[in-house]
Protein backbone atom coordinates (compact mmCIF):
# COMPACT_ATOMS: atom_id res chain seq x y z
CA UNK A 1 0.00 0.00 0.00
CA UNK A 2 1.56 3.27 -1.14
CA UNK A 3 1.96 6.01 1.42
CA UNK A 4 -0.32 8.97 0.91
CA UNK A 5 1.08 12.21 2.24
CA UNK A 6 -0.92 15.17 3.45
CA UNK A 7 -0.87 18.01 0.95
CA UNK A 8 1.69 20.09 2.85
CA UNK A 9 4.03 17.13 3.17
CA UNK A 10 3.56 16.07 -0.45
CA UNK A 11 4.60 19.52 -1.65
CA UNK A 12 7.56 19.49 0.71
CA UNK A 13 8.56 16.01 -0.47
CA UNK A 14 8.58 16.90 -4.16
CA UNK A 15 10.47 20.12 -3.43
CA UNK A 16 13.06 18.17 -1.44
CA UNK A 17 13.48 15.56 -4.18
CA UNK A 18 14.06 18.27 -6.78
CA UNK A 19 16.53 20.05 -4.52
CA UNK A 20 18.44 16.84 -3.76
CA UNK A 21 18.67 16.09 -7.47
CA UNK A 22 20.06 19.55 -8.12
CA UNK A 23 22.23 20.16 -5.06
CA UNK A 24 22.55 16.78 -3.34
CA UNK A 25 20.95 18.02 -0.13
CA UNK A 26 17.68 19.44 1.15
CA UNK A 27 16.32 20.48 4.53
CA UNK A 28 12.70 20.56 5.65
CA UNK A 29 11.77 22.79 8.58
CA UNK A 30 8.23 22.00 9.76
CA UNK A 31 6.70 22.16 13.26
CA UNK A 32 6.46 19.10 15.46
CA UNK A 33 3.28 17.13 14.78
CA UNK A 34 3.03 17.87 11.05
CA UNK A 35 4.31 14.44 9.98
CA UNK A 36 7.86 15.23 8.84
CA UNK A 37 8.99 11.62 9.26
CA UNK A 38 6.53 10.52 6.58
CA UNK A 39 8.39 12.65 4.07
CA UNK A 40 11.48 10.53 4.74
CA UNK A 41 9.43 7.33 4.65
CA UNK A 42 8.06 8.36 1.25
CA UNK A 43 11.62 8.80 0.00
CA UNK A 44 12.40 5.28 1.20
CA UNK A 45 9.27 3.88 -0.41
CA UNK A 46 10.11 5.47 -3.75
CA UNK A 47 13.65 4.07 -3.61
CA UNK A 48 13.21 0.52 -2.23
CA UNK A 49 16.49 -0.78 -3.65
CA UNK A 50 18.58 2.11 -2.31
CA UNK A 51 20.49 1.93 0.97
CA UNK A 52 19.39 4.59 3.45
CA UNK A 53 21.15 5.61 6.65
CA UNK A 54 18.79 7.24 9.15
CA UNK A 55 20.35 9.29 11.95
CA UNK A 56 18.24 10.32 14.95
CA UNK A 57 18.78 11.70 18.47
CA UNK A 58 17.36 8.60 20.13
CA UNK A 59 16.11 5.09 19.52
CA UNK A 60 12.82 6.03 21.18
CA UNK A 61 12.06 8.68 18.56
CA UNK A 62 12.70 6.26 15.71
CA UNK A 63 10.68 3.54 17.47
CA UNK A 64 7.61 5.76 17.80
CA UNK A 65 7.95 6.82 14.16
CA UNK A 66 8.07 3.19 13.08
CA UNK A 67 5.04 2.33 15.22
CA UNK A 68 3.08 5.07 13.49
CA UNK A 69 4.28 3.88 10.09
CA UNK A 70 3.39 0.24 10.76
CA UNK A 71 -0.13 1.20 11.78
CA UNK A 72 -0.59 2.72 8.33
CA UNK A 73 1.43 0.19 6.33
CA UNK A 74 2.46 -3.05 8.11
CA UNK A 75 4.42 -4.23 5.06
CA UNK A 76 6.46 -1.08 4.50
CA UNK A 77 9.91 -1.96 3.05
CA UNK A 78 12.67 -1.22 5.57
CA UNK A 79 15.23 -3.89 4.67
CA UNK A 80 17.68 -1.34 3.27
CA UNK A 81 17.26 1.22 6.04
CA UNK A 82 20.01 1.33 8.68
CA UNK A 83 19.28 3.32 11.82
CA UNK A 84 21.91 4.93 14.06
CA UNK A 85 21.72 7.53 16.81
CA UNK A 86 23.99 10.54 16.82
CA UNK A 87 25.35 9.27 20.13
CA UNK A 88 26.20 5.92 18.51
CA UNK A 89 28.22 7.68 15.83
CA UNK A 90 30.05 9.63 18.51
CA UNK A 91 31.22 6.37 20.07
CA UNK A 92 32.32 4.83 16.78
CA UNK A 93 35.97 4.28 15.98
CA UNK A 94 37.26 5.33 12.58
CA UNK A 95 37.06 1.70 11.47
CA UNK A 96 33.42 1.51 12.54
CA UNK A 97 32.59 4.72 10.69
CA UNK A 98 34.30 3.23 7.64
CA UNK A 99 32.10 0.14 7.96
CA UNK A 100 28.96 2.28 8.06
CA UNK A 101 30.09 4.22 5.01
CA UNK A 102 30.93 0.95 3.24
CA UNK A 103 27.20 0.28 2.99
CA UNK A 104 27.30 2.95 0.26
CA UNK A 105 24.10 4.77 1.20
CA UNK A 106 22.22 6.55 -1.56
CA UNK A 107 20.55 8.74 1.05
CA UNK A 108 21.38 9.90 4.56
CA UNK A 109 18.48 11.22 6.63
CA UNK A 110 19.32 13.60 9.44
CA UNK A 111 16.29 13.61 11.72
CA UNK A 112 16.16 16.55 14.15
CA UNK A 113 19.24 17.80 12.34
CA UNK A 114 19.66 20.81 14.64
CA UNK A 115 20.83 18.30 17.23
CA UNK A 116 23.81 17.50 15.02
CA UNK A 117 25.16 20.88 16.00
CA UNK A 118 26.16 19.56 19.42
CA UNK A 119 29.93 19.56 19.77
CA UNK A 120 30.56 15.80 20.00
CA UNK A 121 27.61 14.67 17.91
CA UNK A 122 28.44 17.17 15.21
CA UNK A 123 32.01 16.03 14.73
CA UNK A 124 31.10 12.39 14.17
CA UNK A 125 28.16 13.27 11.92
CA UNK A 126 30.30 15.47 9.69
CA UNK A 127 32.95 12.76 9.64
CA UNK A 128 30.41 10.24 8.33
CA UNK A 129 29.11 12.66 5.71
CA UNK A 130 32.64 13.15 4.40
CA UNK A 131 32.96 9.38 4.04
CA UNK A 132 29.76 9.29 1.94
CA UNK A 133 30.26 12.04 -0.65
CA UNK A 134 27.83 10.45 -3.13
CA UNK A 135 24.95 10.18 -0.66
CA UNK A 136 22.13 12.67 -0.94
CA UNK A 137 21.24 14.39 2.31
CA UNK A 138 17.70 14.94 3.65
CA UNK A 139 17.27 16.87 6.88
CA UNK A 140 14.19 17.16 9.08
CA UNK A 141 13.68 19.49 12.02
CA UNK A 142 11.17 21.75 13.71
CA UNK A 143 13.80 24.44 14.16
CA UNK A 144 17.09 24.88 12.36
CA UNK A 145 18.36 27.48 14.83
CA UNK A 146 20.32 26.51 17.95
CA UNK A 147 19.21 29.44 20.06
CA UNK A 148 21.40 28.62 23.06
CA UNK A 149 24.44 28.05 20.84
CA UNK A 150 25.00 31.56 19.49
CA UNK A 151 21.96 31.19 17.21
CA UNK A 152 23.76 28.81 14.89
CA UNK A 153 21.78 28.03 11.74
CA UNK A 154 22.21 24.30 11.14
CA UNK A 155 20.42 24.51 7.79
CA UNK A 156 23.20 26.81 6.69
CA UNK A 157 25.99 24.72 8.21
CA UNK A 158 24.83 21.28 7.06
CA UNK A 159 22.73 22.06 3.99
CA UNK A 160 24.26 25.26 2.62
CA UNK A 161 20.88 26.91 3.32
CA UNK A 162 19.13 24.54 0.89
CA UNK A 163 15.72 24.56 2.59
CA UNK A 164 13.09 22.86 0.43
CA UNK A 165 10.18 23.74 2.70
CA UNK A 166 9.88 26.03 5.71
CA UNK A 167 6.73 26.28 7.81
CA UNK A 168 6.29 28.17 11.06
CA UNK A 169 4.16 26.97 13.95
CA UNK A 170 1.83 29.90 13.43
CA UNK A 171 1.36 29.02 9.77
CA UNK A 172 0.59 25.40 10.67
CA UNK A 173 -2.10 26.53 13.10
CA UNK A 174 -3.64 29.05 10.68
CA UNK A 175 -3.76 26.44 7.91
CA UNK A 176 -5.46 23.93 10.20
CA UNK A 177 -2.56 21.49 10.04
CA UNK A 178 -2.12 21.73 13.81
CA UNK A 179 -4.82 22.57 16.37
CA UNK A 180 -4.79 26.01 17.94
CA UNK A 181 -3.38 25.81 21.47
CA UNK A 182 -5.42 26.78 24.50
CA UNK A 183 -3.35 29.19 26.58
CA UNK A 184 -4.16 29.57 30.26
CA UNK A 185 -2.27 32.10 32.35
CA UNK A 186 -2.28 32.56 36.09
CA UNK A 187 -0.08 33.87 38.89
CA UNK A 188 1.36 32.15 41.91
CA UNK A 189 3.70 32.90 44.80
CA UNK A 190 3.14 36.62 44.40
CA UNK A 191 3.67 37.49 48.07
CA UNK A 192 7.37 38.25 47.60
CA UNK A 193 6.60 40.53 44.68
CA UNK A 194 3.95 42.37 46.67
CA UNK A 195 6.37 42.81 49.56
CA UNK A 196 8.96 44.26 47.18
CA UNK A 197 6.43 46.67 45.71
CA UNK A 198 5.31 47.67 49.21
CA UNK A 199 8.89 48.55 50.12
CA UNK A 200 9.18 50.73 47.02
CA UNK A 201 5.92 52.52 47.87
CA UNK A 202 7.04 53.04 51.47
CA UNK A 203 10.26 54.64 50.24
CA UNK A 204 8.49 57.24 48.09
CA UNK A 205 9.26 60.71 49.43
CA UNK A 206 6.14 62.49 48.26
CA UNK A 207 3.14 61.75 50.46
CA UNK A 208 0.71 62.41 47.61
CA UNK A 209 2.48 60.07 45.19
CA UNK A 210 2.82 57.50 47.97
CA UNK A 211 -0.94 57.55 48.65
CA UNK A 212 -1.82 57.10 44.97
CA UNK A 213 0.58 54.19 44.54
CA UNK A 214 -0.60 52.59 47.78
CA UNK A 215 -4.17 52.57 46.44
CA UNK A 216 -3.01 50.84 43.26
CA UNK A 217 -1.01 48.31 45.25
CA UNK A 218 -3.92 47.57 47.59
CA UNK A 219 -6.20 47.03 44.60
CA UNK A 220 -3.67 44.66 43.06
CA UNK A 221 -3.39 42.74 46.34
CA UNK A 222 -7.17 42.33 46.58
CA UNK A 223 -7.40 41.15 42.95
CA UNK A 224 -4.67 38.58 43.46
CA UNK A 225 -6.22 37.29 46.66
CA UNK A 226 -9.48 36.66 44.81
CA UNK A 227 -7.80 34.86 41.89
CA UNK A 228 -7.88 31.08 41.74
CA UNK A 229 -4.78 29.30 42.95
CA UNK A 230 -2.87 26.80 40.82
CA UNK A 231 -4.71 23.90 42.45
CA UNK A 232 -8.06 25.19 41.15
CA UNK A 233 -6.64 26.20 37.76
CA UNK A 234 -5.10 22.75 37.24
CA UNK A 235 -8.24 20.95 38.42
CA UNK A 236 -10.34 22.92 35.93
CA UNK A 237 -8.09 22.63 32.87
CA UNK A 238 -6.28 19.30 33.32
CA UNK A 239 -9.00 16.78 32.60
CA UNK A 240 -6.85 13.74 31.80
CA UNK A 241 -5.59 12.39 35.12
CA UNK A 242 -3.19 9.97 33.40
CA UNK A 243 -1.91 12.47 30.82
CA UNK A 244 1.68 13.53 30.31
CA UNK A 245 2.61 17.12 31.07
CA UNK A 246 5.84 19.11 30.86
CA UNK A 247 6.93 21.63 33.47
CA UNK A 248 9.70 24.05 32.48
CA UNK A 249 11.95 25.24 35.30
CA UNK A 250 14.75 27.78 35.38
CA UNK A 251 17.30 25.50 37.05
CA UNK A 252 17.74 22.57 39.45
CA UNK A 253 16.93 24.66 42.51
CA UNK A 254 13.76 25.98 40.91
CA UNK A 255 12.77 22.45 39.91
CA UNK A 256 13.23 21.16 43.46
CA UNK A 257 11.07 23.99 44.76
CA UNK A 258 8.32 23.26 42.23
CA UNK A 259 8.38 19.54 43.04
CA UNK A 260 7.67 20.33 46.68
CA UNK A 261 4.38 21.95 45.64
CA UNK A 262 3.18 19.10 43.40
CA UNK A 263 0.93 17.36 46.00
CA UNK A 264 -0.75 20.69 46.75
CA UNK A 265 -1.15 21.91 43.17
CA UNK A 266 -2.29 18.63 41.64
CA UNK A 267 -4.58 17.51 44.47
CA UNK A 268 -7.65 18.33 42.42
CA UNK A 269 -6.33 16.50 39.35
CA UNK A 270 -5.08 13.32 40.96
CA UNK A 271 -4.78 13.11 44.76
CA UNK A 272 -2.67 9.97 44.36
CA UNK A 273 0.06 11.73 42.39
CA UNK A 274 3.52 10.44 43.33
CA UNK A 275 6.52 12.76 43.46
Please describe what each predicted stretch is.
Residues 1-29:
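Conserved pre-motif I regulatory segment
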Residues 16, 39-47, 124, 128:
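Hydrophobic residues on the short alpha-helix immediately C-terminal to a glycine-rich phosphate/catalytic loop
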Residues 22-43, 248:
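Walker A/P-loop
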Residues 62-104:
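Inter-Walker segment of RecA-like/P-loop motor cores
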Residues 86, 98-145:
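SF2 helicase catalytic motif II
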Residues 149-245:
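Interdomain helical connector at the RecA1-RecA2 junction of SF1/SF2 helicase-like NTPases
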Amino acid sequence: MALRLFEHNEKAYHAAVRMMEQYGKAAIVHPTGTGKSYIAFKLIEDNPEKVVIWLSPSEYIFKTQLESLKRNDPDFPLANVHFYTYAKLMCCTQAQLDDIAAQEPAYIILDEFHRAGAECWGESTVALLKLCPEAKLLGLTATNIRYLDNNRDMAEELFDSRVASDMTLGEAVVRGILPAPNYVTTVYQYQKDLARYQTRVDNLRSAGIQDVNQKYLDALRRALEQADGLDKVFAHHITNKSGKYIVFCANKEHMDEMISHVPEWFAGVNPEVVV
